[in-house]
């Protein structure tokens, strides 16, 4: 769950 959340945040940023 941590990696996917990081990926979503990175996509937004």
From Swiss-Prot:
The modification Leucine amide is found at residue 13. Belongs to the frog skin active peptide (FSAP) family. Temporin subfamily. GO terms for biological process: defense response to Gram-positive bacterium; innate immune response. Keywords: Amidation, Amphibian defense peptide, Antibiotic, Antimicrobial, Immunity, Innate immunity, Secreted. Its main location: secreted. It is found in: Secreted. This is Temporin-1Tc.
């Amino acid at each position: 769950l941590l990696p996917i959340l990081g990926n979503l945040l990175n996509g937004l940023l």
